[in-house]
Structures are given as structure tokens and as C-alpha cells.
Amino acid sequence: MRYFLDTEYNGFGGALISLALAPESGDDEFYAIVKCPDPIVPWVERHVMPYIDMVPIGLGHPALERLDAAQALSSYLAGDTNPEIVADWPEDIAQFCMLLLTTSGDMVEIAPTTFTLLRLPGFSTAANSKIPHNALYDARALRHFVLKSER
């Protein structure tokens, strides 16, 4: 199955703050907030943090330690033998992959996974998102745009 990915992170090259997967099927979404070890940069403090908890009941929970978030992601994808992760920004894929790492030389269990990076000139997740700079709503916006363009 395809999963549309969005992440929020602490400025350019900064630590992961939240990660969302919106499956093509439209149900059983994944959303995790990750404890950030660094002080939050001002732009993120203004544009991301006020909206980070604005998710549907059942998806909201306290921020997780990085390892716990990695294990939650592994559990979420466990039933899919060939997930495809779709993103419109390279940093989203990089953050996803970095979350999989647990220690030097080790990672959480995950099936063989395909990554698709879409270059979408003129499309902005933030401009099309119900709650801009919220990873879940941005992932939903990406899913909606891609599925609509495929019709």
C-alpha cells in the first residue's frame, strides 16, 4: 500500500518533531510526536508547535522518546509486506529513514520498503492543508492531491 508521508522537524536539518503517514486507503493513519532534544527554533515555535497536538481523538498522545516512536512506526507498518512511502520533499524521507535507526548498526523491523519522491511544482502541502505545518494534515493534503491528479 502507498502511505503519504509528512514530517515536521526543528529547522533545516534539525531533529524530527512529528511524523505522519496517511495511507492511500484513507483509514488507520499514523501520527507520532517525537521528543526534541534541542531547543525549538523560533520559526518552528511559531508555525509548528501551536498545531502539533491538533489531531483527531485516538491519534493524539504525548511526545514519545525516539526509540518508542521508531517501534510504533515499525508496529504500524508490520502488516504490510511491501509498503511504499510517498513524499514531496527529500527531508521527509530522510527523517523517516533516520527514525528507523535505533543504535549504531541496528534498526527497527520493517518490510522491504519503496520510497517515491514526487516533484510537484505549484503544489504546497501547507497551502492545501486544513492545518498547515501539522504533519498529519499535510500528509492528508499530499494524499488528496496525488490521488486526485491520478484520476
Go through each PLM region and give its residues.
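Acidic, Mg2+-coordinating catalytic module of metal-dependent nucleases/exonucleases
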Residues: W89, T125-R151
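Residue-level signal for well-ordered alpha-helical scaffold segments within enzymatic catalytic domains
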Residues: S75, M98, H144-K148
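Conserved protein kinase catalytic core
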Residues: F12-G14, A94, H144
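Substrate-recognition/cap helix-loop segment adjacent to the acidic, metal-dependent catalytic center
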Residues: E91-I110
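Alpha-helical packing segments of well-folded alpha/beta enzyme cores
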Residues: A69-L73, D92, L142
